[in-house]
Amino acid sequence: LDKTANTQRWHDDVRFYQVFNEHQQLIGGFYFDLYARPGKRGGAWMSGFQARYQHDDSGYQQLPVCFMVANFSPAPTGAQRGKPSLLTHDEVLTLFHEFGHGLHHLLTEVNVGDVAGVNGVEWDAVELPSQFMENWAWHPEGIALISRHVDTGETLPESMLQSMLAAKNFQSGMQTLRQLEFALFDLLLHAKTPAPDYPQLLALLDSVRADVSIMPTASYNRFA
């Protein structure tokens, strides 16, 4: 990575990095706009600014560029000036997740822009690199590399990480059942010919929930 100041940025908080491979060849660029500010859209996301493309006849090559946007708390001002921006573990997960999308976009070797990087990838498959990256924020070695106490500099204690993992995994089977509900409903819905109308759609969803869900769903619930 090479932090570059000589590029256009839409705010002073934005950082731009050029990305090189092991042969020191430039392969892309990555914008980071990580901190909340007035008027900025909420949430966190990664978007491709331009995709990798190469014209075989002329040899013209366009390198991928993407940007990651988040709304982390900026470094404090006033009496606390000089202190760093602090992230919760959930925010670290967000950082790793969106960074995974960025790597997916930047590390592509596909030369057709419409299907390079995150372009043209099914919505379920496009989440694979990002969710894979989240695992490093739960791994002891990964946490030891990136965590520091703001005052003492100590890494996150192993006991605290184990407590966080226990909380994460508590009733995690319920999350799996929820995903099974989505998957079965999707498969059954798209197998219907002709397409069901709204009452039939709700009846189909209720039948899936009756097979999969442990907790009953309120009768007034509307899937959205």
Which positions does each model-derived feature cover?
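Cation-handling catalytic/transport regions enriched in His/Asp/Glu
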Residues: 1-224
